[in-house]
C-alpha cells in the first residue's frame, strides 16, 4: 500500500463519428438495429483483443513477472446521448480490476501499467472495427474530413450532410471552441506552439470544466428520439431524412478480405490486395515498408521514446480510410507496427530466453510465447535520429557561440521591456526573473537553462527571453 486509492476497475467508453449517431437517431428500424448490432459486436471484438493482448497480471516478489490471466469480467452499459442531449449512442465497458491468474488460479489485479498505456490503441482498434462492421453489413463508404473547429481528421459516412453533423454536435463544438481559445492564449503567453501532450491536457481540463450534470430523471429513448426529430425540424428544416438514407445507401464499397490457411501469410496477402485497391505502386512488401516508415515518422512527431502500443495505435490511424475484414483488421495493423518497430532502436535489453519446451508453462511463459520477466508491451523504443539528437544536445552543453546579447545588453533590453509592460497594464519582471532572463540572453553557451519550482514565474520569464531573441534575430 503506497497510500494511493485502490482501483476497483476501468471504464472503457466507446466512441464513433457523429454521422453514425445521425443514422442511428433518424434511420429506419432496420438501420438502427443494424447499427446496434455492429456496435455490440465491435465492443465484444475490442474486449477480446484487450484480453488477448493486455489483460495480464503480475507475480513474484514486487510483481516482477507479467503473467497470463483467465480473461476479464465486467458489464456493458448502453447510453444514447451526450450531456447536451444530442444523439450519441455509446457503451461504457466497466472492467473489473480483479482477475484470476492462469498459472495458480489465485485472484489478483490487472497489470495497470499496460492498461493505461494501451488505452489509445484500444480506442483506435474499436473505431476501425466498428467502421469495418458497418461497411460489412451496409456497404457504406467513408470520407476522411477535418473535424469542425479542430485540426483532427474524422472518418464520416458519405451522404450524411455536414449541416446535420454540426447541428447535433453541440457539446463537441463547445469543447473544441474553448480548447482552441486556451491553446491560442497559452501560445501567446509562452511564444511557442503547444505540443501534443499539453493539448491533450487542455482538452481534458476543458472537458471537465464544461461537463453538464445529468438530469435527475432520464427521459425514455422514445422521448429522446421525439426531441431529436423536433430539433431536426428547427435546425435543418430543409433536410429530408428519406433522401439522406437513399444517398447513404446508394454508395457501396467492399471489404478487403483474404482466405488463407496459414495465418502467417494473411498480412502479406492482404497488404498486396490493399496496395492494389488503393492504387499504390508496388506490392505488399513495398506498401508495408511505406506504411511502416509513415508510422514511425508520425510516432516520432509525438514522442521521443515509445512502446509497441504507441506504434500500433498509429498504424490503426494510418489505416483509418481502409475498410478491412474485421477478423483480419488487427493482423494487418500489427503487421505494419511490427515492421515499423523493426526500424526502431530497442532501448530495453533482452535478458532471458525461454528454455525449449516451456511455451505451455504459464508460470514462466506468456500466451504470446515470451518469458514473463520481459514483457514486450513494456519495452521502450526510439530511433537512431533521436539518439543522435540526444548526443548532439549533450555535446552542445560544452560549446560556446558568438550569438546572443553582449554582457549588459540583455539587461538593458529587459529594462525597456519592463517599462512597456507597465505602460500596457501588464506585469514587469521581478528582480530574480530579470536576472534569470538576462543570464539566458547574455550567456555565451550554446545551451543554457533556467530552473525553478512551479509558480515562480518561469513562463513569464521565458516570454521576455523569447521576445528579446526575436527582436534581435
Description of each model-found segment:
Residues 1-473:
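Helicase P-loop NTPase motor core of nucleic-acid translocases
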Amino acid at each position: 500500500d503506497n497510500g494511493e486509492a485502490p482501483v476497483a476497475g476501468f471504464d472503457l467508453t466507446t466512441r464513433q463519428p457523429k454521422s453514425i449517431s445521425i443514422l442511428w437517431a433518424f434511420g429506419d428500424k432496420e438501420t438502427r438495429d443494424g447499427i446496434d448490432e455492429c456496435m455490440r459486436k465491435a465492443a465484444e471484438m475490442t474486449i477480446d483483443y484487450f484480453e488477448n493482448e493486455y489483460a495480464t497480471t503480475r507475480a513474484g516478489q514486487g510483481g516482477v513477472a507479467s503473467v497470463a490471466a483467465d480473461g476479464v469480467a465486467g458489464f456493458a452499459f448502453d447510453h444514447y446521448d451526450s450531456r447536451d442531449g444530442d444523439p450519441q449512442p455509446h457503451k461504457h465497458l466497466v472492467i473489473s480490476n480483479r482477475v484470476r491468474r492462469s498459472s495458480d488460479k489465485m485472484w489478483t489485479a490487472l497489470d495497470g501499467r499496460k492498461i493505461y498505456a494501451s488505452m489509445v490503441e484500444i480506442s483506435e482498434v474499436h473505431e476501425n472495427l466498428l467502421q469495418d462492421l458497418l461497411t460489412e453489413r451496409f456497404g457504406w463508404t467513408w470520407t476522411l474530413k477535418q473535424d469542425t473547429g479542430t485540426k483532427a481528421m474524422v472518418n464520416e459516412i458519405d451522404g450524411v450532410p455536414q449541416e446535420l453533423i454540426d447541428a447535433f454536435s453541440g457539446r463537441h463544438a463547445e469543447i473544441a471552441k474553448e480548447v482552441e481559445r486556451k491553446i491560442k492564449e497559452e501560445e501567446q503567453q509562452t511564444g511557442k506552439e503547444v505540443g501534443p501532450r499539453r493539448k491533450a491536457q487542455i482538452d481534458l481540463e476543458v472537458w471537465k470544466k464544461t461537463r453538464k450534470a445529468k438530469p435527475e430523471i432520464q427521459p425514455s429513448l422514445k422521448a429522446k428520439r421525439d426531441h431529436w426529430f423536433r430539433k431536426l425540424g428547427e435546425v435543418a428544416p430543409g433536410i429530408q431524412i428519406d433522401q439522406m438514407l437513399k444517398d447513404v445507401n446508394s454508395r457501396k464499397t467492399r471489404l478487403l478480405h483474404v482466405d488463407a490457411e496459414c495465418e502467417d501469410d494473411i498480412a502479406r496477402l492482404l497488404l498486396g490486395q490493399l496496395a492494389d485497391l488503393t492504387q499504390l505502386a508496388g506490392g505488399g512488401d513495398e506498401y508495408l515498408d511505406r506504411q511502416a516508415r509513415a508510422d514511425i515518422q508520425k510516432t516520432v512527431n509525438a514522442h521521443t521514446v515509445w512502446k509497441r502500443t504507441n506504434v500500433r495505435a498509429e498504424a490503426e490511424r494510418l489505416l483509418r480510410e481502409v475498410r478491412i475484414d474485421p477478423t483480419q483488421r488487427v493482423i494487418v495493423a500489427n503487421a505494419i507496427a511490427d515492421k515499423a518497430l523493426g526500424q526502431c532502436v530497442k532501448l530495453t535489453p533482452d535478458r532471458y530466453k525461454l528454455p525449449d519446451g516451456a511455451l505451455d508453462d504459464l508460470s514462466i511463459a506468456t500466451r504470446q510465447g515470451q518469458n514473463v520477466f520481459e514483457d514486450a508491451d513494456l519495452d521502450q523504443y526510439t530511433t537512431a535520429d533521436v539518439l543522435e539528437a540526444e548526443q548532439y544536445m549533450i555535446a552542445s552543453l560544452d560549446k560556446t557561440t558568438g550569438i546572443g546579447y553582449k554582457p549588459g545588453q540583455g539587461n538593458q533590453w529587459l529594462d525597456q521591456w519592463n517599462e512597456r509592460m507597465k505602460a500596457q497594464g501588464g506585469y514587469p519582471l521581478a528582480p530574480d526573473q530579470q536576472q534569470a532572463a538576462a543570464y539566458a540572453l547574455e550567456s555565451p553557451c550554446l545551451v543554457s537553462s533556467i530552473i525553478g519550482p512551479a509558480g515562480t514565474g518561469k513562463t513569464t520569464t521565458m516570454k521576455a527571453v523569447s521576445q528579446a531573441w526575436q527582436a534581435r534575430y
